Amino acid sequence: MYDRVADLSLEIESYDLEPLEHAVSPEFKRRTTVVRLRGEGHEGIGEDVTYSPEDQEGFQSEGHSVPLAGSHSLDSFSQLLDRLALWPAGPAIEQFRPYRRWAFESAALDLALRQAGAPLHEVIGLQPLPVTFVSSMRLGEPASIEPVKRWLDAFPKLRFKLDPTSTWDDALVTSLVETRAVDTLDLKGAYKGTPVDQEADPTLYARVAMAFPNVWIEDPALTEETDPVLEPHRARITWDAPIHSVSDIHGLPFPPRTLNFKPSRFGSVRALLDAYDYCGEQRIGIYGGGQNELGQGRSQIQYLASLFHPDMPNDVAPKAYNNADPAPGLPTSPLAPAPSKTGFRWGETS
């Protein structure tokens, strides 16, 4: 599929960086950076979703230090990025490295399409469809069902992706099962050195796998203790954090039935579209994931979900679902198709 966009012409005259921030909760202020590429009277937008505030501040302070101006194709621009130092000082965590690359690549895709006067779906030959979404959340420490109840009171049909922790006891699990609103459990077993790390816990894994027989089980840490617990449930095991390329899919401990794709993890448009092609050939299901985007990055992942996996439990809810408390009048699932007339954008009329 990449060959359908690789040769798009791309004229870049300048670029700007725009800082975004939002207090998700009293304890967490999210910061991102919008990349705006400009050329021929058009603008292409991408978003760096790196979680480290220091990395974001460093990026923004560098200004226009990356030499991007010139005439390119989308593919030659990607090759240029291979040679440029997008992280002069290196990221706080190595997993963040592709996030900045994706900001420039998605902005370039948007700009090239706008300069061509065409939307993404038209160029790659896919039809946007209504997007099913879930709301992703953690339940605090100690864990409580109250966040789920609060959102269900406001939106009774809302469905969830939840992050189990070792403080989930039988009573909490029973209460969550009774909601019948959980689609995915993210065990966070692939994270190291982050605030959301969850150690391999065979007791927790057994508890949730048995209690939720029909949900996806994402990113378990498979060890001598946990692998036997989850072996009967392998058809429901999915992977997110380890997936950056087709080679990562090949490297999984067993063939997956379904995967979670976060475009920013792939870094390049080519790596993402090659992975979509591979999963289509191998009949591997996909659902989309988000990175608490604050800008156009969120609507871009909604656009991709509408094209490649609209009916799956996509973790691409509108941005307001990332807040601690629900607000009235939020869009509900499924989201109606809303591609822009040109570019890699969603929810805009132009």
Describe the residue ranges of each PLM region.
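Metal- or metallocofactor-binding catalytic centers and their adjacent structured scaffolds
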Residues: 2, 38-39, 43-116
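C-terminal extensions of enzymes
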Residues: 322-350
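Glycine-rich beta-alpha junction loops
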Residues: 39, 51, 292-294, 320
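Active-site-facing alpha/beta catalytic cores
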Residues: 96-222
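N-terminal amphipathic alpha-helix/helix-capping segment at the start of soluble metabolic enzymes
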Residues: 1-14, 35, 106, 114, ...
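Catalytic core of soluble alpha/beta enzymes
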Residues: 168-305, 314-315, 322-331
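Structured beta-strand/loop patches that form or line metal/cofactor-binding pockets in enzymes
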Residues: 1-56, 333
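Short glycine/serine/threonine/alanine-rich loop segments
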Residues: 118, 284, 310
